[in-house]
């Protein structure tokens, strides 16, 4: 009985993690353009617009740039346009 309840708890926990992570994995952070761009790595002094664009072009996207998020924009992420 104890083994069955432990298995059920593990399965339930994994199902919750999968459901939550599937929403996060999509990578779309911009609500207005969620279907037209994919955002991932935070932009830094080393990862700027040029580097972001290069990464996106290498992944066969049309273009890429650092996009600010928040009001006011407090963080920037590298976003590839589809």
UniProtKB/Swiss-Prot annotation:
Coiled coil: none annotated. Keywords: Antimicrobial, Disulfide bond, Fungicide, Plant defense, Secreted, Signal. Residues 1-27 form the signal peptide. GO terms for cellular component: extracellular region. The keyword Secreted applies. Its main location: secreted. The keyword Magnesium does not apply. InterPro entries: Defensin-like_dom. One of its GO terms (biological process) is defense response to fungus. Belongs to the DEFL family. This is Putative defensin-like protein 70. It comes from Arabidopsis thaliana (Mouse-ear cress).
